[in-house]
Amino acid sequence: MGMNINRRSFFGGLAASVAMTGCKGLLGRGERPMLRLGVISDIHITTPGPESTDKFRTALREFRSLGADAVLVAGDLADWGLRSNLKTVKAVWDEVMGGTDAIPLMITGNHDFDGWRYGDMTLDMHMQGYSEDEALKTLGMKACWEEIFHEPFADIRKRTVKGFDFVSVEWHVDGKEKNDALVAQWLKDHAAELKGDRPFFFFRHSPIPNTVSSSSKDPENALYRALQAFPNCVAFCGHTHRTFFDEGSVWQDGFTAISIPSMEYQGALRGYENGSDHRRGGSKCSMPRMPMQGEHADAQGYFVSVFADRLEIKRLDFAAGEEIEPWTLPWPIAAGKPFAAGERAKVTPVPEFPSDAQVALRVYNADTRGGHWTIFWELTFPRATAEGGRVLDYEVRAEMAADGSVAAVKRFLSPAFHKVEREEPETVRVYFDGMDVPESGRYRLAVYPRNCFGRAGRPIFTRWLESKPGKAKAKGMAQQ
């Protein structure tokens, strides 16, 4: 997970944003960067009130104090996709960045087109006195954008800041979401303008397939394949609300890709007993769910300094008011590719439990997320740590005594995986569904601490167990 060493406070969190004085740039070597860039995504603005705008305002103030030449915002500006949402975005920008030369580099995301029709958001929108009658999609995104931001709008744009090109792609390209094939063709048509030793920045809302840890897998994706021809490309994407404490948020191969966290909330990963639910439900996970989105209300972003031989990327946790250990990408990309997934996996620290760590075990009766009564094993143990790193999750395996085989596996996110490390509780508690352990035979539950690349430290074990806890009773309850 993301390094927390050399962490420092750069302001007193959101509550102190008005009094914030900013922080000195982490420039190193006394050099002045050729470009300073603030990078955020998914600001999800609704109303003009501070509950909706303060996080965006705080980020802009920090970027202003650092002397940003431009601020990149990679989509989902307007949570409900309304004209008034977009006007609020512009008003906050003018309030904070007015009088500077900083250039706004903003694009649309799915919410900017369709947020008004997402069920829970439609209800919230109506309750606060707003209506889909002012939907940007209905009124015309191009007309509204140009009226509000006073700049030309196009599905694909190339803008230049201090000699560096920025290629932006909107959520809809030629009337189709993403439309990667058309974007790929645009890149091929403009290759002569973009290729070279100087980096150029590509940004859109959703991740490019086959890159960062939150991206989808599609080896034949046209955009992914097209960008392989541009080793000088640095691609920024948002959408997934993936915390930057996941070291897989940076990827290098034929080009560089970086996932931008959300300014509204960091999402819980799927595939975990305490992970994310799909918006429409259907989760079959057993453990009590992670806190809902409002309780994940963390705001994170980057400040990028471009030098002749490297990119320095500060990780800024605006909610905690802290700067996390930065990422430094040597330039050109051919200089070792230290952020290639395989290389990162080799050097990212592996978490370990304290030498005297033990697992406490008890039976716990509760309902699963699906509303079915069952019996859990409740496991309690001290948190794992990694020097210069973080624990992402804990893998619990039911290991058989007879042959060492693994009869069942469940994974649990560390309670504060998305927050600064000091927020991690000293004691972790997870729930393993007792109906998934072996029917017979001796077994024990082994707990493995893992980093974001799935590398595990040494496990700790429960006592040896003989059978399912309360199996007969659970079966009887299920049949009633």
Tell me what each language-model feature is:
Residues 191-212:
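Short acidic, glycine-rich surface-loop motifs adjacent to enzyme active sites
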Residues 423-439:
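Signal that preferentially marks extracellular ectodomain short beta-strand elements
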Residues 2-18:
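N-terminal secretory signal peptides and thylakoid transit peptides that target proteins
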Residues 83-194, 222-229, 245-291, 295, ...:
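Extended active-site neighborhood of metal-dependent phosphoesterases/phosphodiesterases
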Residues 26-86:
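N-terminal active-site segment of His-dependent metallophosphoesterases
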Residues 437-454:
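Beta-strand-rich modules
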Residues 283-415, 460, 464-480:
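A short C-terminal boundary segment appended to hydrolase-like catalytic domains
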Residues 40-41, 71-76, 104-110, 202-205, ...:
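Active-site neighborhood of phospho(di)ester-bond hydrolases with catalytic His/Asp-centered motifs
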